[in-house]
Each structure stands twice: as structure tokens, then as C-alpha cells.
Amino acid sequence: MHEMSLAEGIRGIVEDVARENGATRVARVVLEIGELASVEVEALRFCLDVVLKDSVADGAAVDIEAVPGSGWCMQCATVVPIAQRYDACPQCGGYQVQPTGGTEMRVKELALGD
């Protein structure tokens, strides 16, 4: 389960930002996760519950915002919505769709406390 290593990476980012800003507590963590990022959101939530314990973010609210998947269809030369990496283009039915959005995962916002 790679979600555990993702959660550990998030903890590292959160701790670094808190330290850089002199914060002793993080009240809220907002993540953006693309629908095409190959992340099981519920598994990540579970892992975050585990790795954030005894850290500056222990007890912090974790909000996850989904970023819809999109891709560039080479056949009809347009950006189209896609739910999975290998979906057909919803306009022309072609399979030459290059993902352009929804592949990202990032820490979008942190609410720091004293």
C-alpha cells in the first residue's frame, strides 16, 4: 500500500512548514488529489490518522479536495473529461487521450496554530 509512504511524505511537509513558521500545532490540512493520481483516498485517510499521531498535526482536520481528470484527445484536438487514464474520448471514441489534469497530489493549505 503506497498510501502509507504518501502519508509519511505529507507528515514531513506539514512538520517542515510548521517548523519554518514557528508553529507548534497544525489545526487543518487541505490536500488536493487528482482522480487520476492512483491514490485510494480512504486508505490515505486511514494512513494519515496513523502517521499524524504524536506530531504537530495530531488531531488536525484533514480535508481532501478531488481534482477531476481531464485529457487532450489527439484525434479531435480538444480537452475532454476522463475518469480513468485509459478511457476513450467521450466525443469521438478514440483512445489517443493524454492526461492533462487530475494526476496531481499536493498539500494545498495548512492552518497553523500556536
UniProtKB/Swiss-Prot annotation:
Gene field: hypA
Protein name, UniProt field: Hydrogenase maturation factor HypA
GO biological process: protein maturation; protein modification process
GO molecular function, one term: nickel cation binding
Family: Belongs to the HypA/HybF family.
Organism in which the protein naturally occurs: Azoarcus sp. (strain BH72)
Keywords assigned: Metal-binding, Nickel, Zinc
HAMAP family, per database record: HypA_HybF
Main function: Involved in the maturation of [NiFe] hydrogenases. Required for nickel insertion into the metal center of the hydrogenase.
Positions annotated to bind Zn(2+): C73, C76, C89, C92
Pfam short name (any one): HypA
Database matches in Gene3D superfamilies: 3.30.2320.80
Binding sites annotated in the UniProt record for Ni(2+): H2
